[in-house]
Amino acid sequence: YSAEGRLDQLRFFDHWLKGIDTGIMSEPSVKLLIRKGGHGNSEWRFENEWPLERTRWTRFFLQPHARNGDESLGRLMAEAPRKTVSMSYSASGKTKAGVASASWTSTALAGSLPQMGVSFETAPLGDDTEVTGPVVLVLWVASSTEDMDIFATIRNIAPDGSDVFELGQQSQPVPVGKGWLRASQRKLDPALSLPWRPYHVHAERQWLEPGEPVRVEIEIWPTCMVFKRGHRIRLDVQPRDGVGSAPYTHYAADYNTGTNTIFAGGARASYLLLPVIPRRA
């Protein structure tokens, strides 16, 4: 939606539809907008492949950990807990999907609603950290009912605790990335799935057995962000639309009530797989 992006489209169509040599086919095959936090703080960069060959696929393991008495806030760690632990939350949250939980003010500006889902944060980053490429969230989950809606959001948290938003195509504030999955749709096509991109078949419903843990892989759309030194990477896992959802909201299934649980560590390690890009020498 940028001026340069529209110009690239025009150059592409001029080349193929009008036979005009715009030079676009002589450029590298991948062009990325490298976001550095905040509207207007970005730059264009050429690459030769996607995902980037130099990607360091890095697992950030979920670790439940109360901080300042907040039982819903855990940590993203380099190592998984040795023993399996868990965090539970209400499957319905405090609001109705499509009303307060998906409103402009509550999800786009004010941040996540209290007592809705659980969150995990890294420690303050010691250096600027670029994340560019596809993202996958692997969770071990259970529910007290037959299904479970999972809304995953990646956020850029400044040292003062505020969100660093980007600007969406309709000028709305947006977080770093989002992904969604209904647990009954978790079945994968092993031939088409990749370590960094699960491919769900959506051909049958695999209902949950109440209280029985299952493994799910959630695709979070490809993104790019340079998290600045001192910032935190935050992951929200919620039963409803979270921060930065407006105007594209969802309505959760009526049967998704009760209690959802996320497991971490031991044989049920949950993790966020991020494409960390090392600095070029």
PLM feature segments, named:
Residues 1-281:
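C-terminal, loop-rich substrate-recognition/catalytic regions characterized by aromatic stacking residues
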